[in-house]
Each structure stands twice: as C-alpha cells, then as structure tokens.
C-alpha cells in the first residue's frame, strides 16, 4: 500500500534551531530517506519553501481566485512530504515515527486512495 506522510511544523520552532541543529536535522532526514530507499519503501520526498511563498487557488462559477498564503490560519504549516510503500497502516505509522522532523513537528499519515 502507498501512504503519504505529510510533515507539519511551526515555522518559528524551525527558525529557532541553531545552525548545528539544522545541519543535523538535514543530515538525519537525508539518511532516513536513503534508509527507506534501500529497503524499497521510499517513493518520493520533498521539503517545501516557507508558507510565505504559498499561493491558494480556488475556482468558483468557472472563475479562478488566486490569493497569497495558505488557506487556513494554523500554527503548524505543511513543510514537506514523504511518499512511502508499506505493508499496512501499522508499518506506515512505524515508518512515520522514524522521520526526523517528527521530533520538531507532526507527521500526518494517510493512505493513497486506490481508484483501481
């Protein structure tokens, strides 16, 4: 089964990390991605630019409305994702627990919808 691990964190919490802590987090994250890839469970991953670069698009009555920023006002914002292959939800949750960003934020795990 395929699962997406959505990585959320508070921007202030991340910006308060020291350069050494940021470097360690980057190193740990890349190493974990490589570990998942070696085990055949990694599909894709990406970190996202800050929320200030976000644009929101809605189409109503056939007309697009584009606004700056995210749709909702929340403390934690989407920072990235890891798309994985797991045997079941329990394995996906175990994988999510190992994501280094889980130490600084929240990982939301959702199964892919199979239109099959």
Sequence positions of predicted segments:
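Conserved, structured core segments of small domains
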Residues: 1-116
């Amino acid at each position: 089964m395929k699962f997406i691990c959505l990585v959320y964190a508070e921007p202030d919490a991340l910006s308060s990390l020291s350069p050494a802590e940021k470097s360690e987090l980057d190193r740990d994250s890349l190493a974990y991605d490589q570990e998942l890839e070696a085990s055949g469970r990694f599909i894709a991953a990406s970190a996202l630019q800050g929320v200030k670069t976000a644009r929101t698009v809605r189409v109503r009555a056939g007309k697009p409305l584009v606004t700056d920023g995210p749709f909702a006002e929340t403390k934690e914002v989407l920072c990235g994702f890891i798309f994985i292959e797991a045997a079941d939800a329990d394995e996906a949750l175990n994988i999510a627990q190992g994501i280094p960003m889980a130490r600084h934020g929240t990982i939301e795990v959702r199964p892919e919808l199979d239109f099959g």
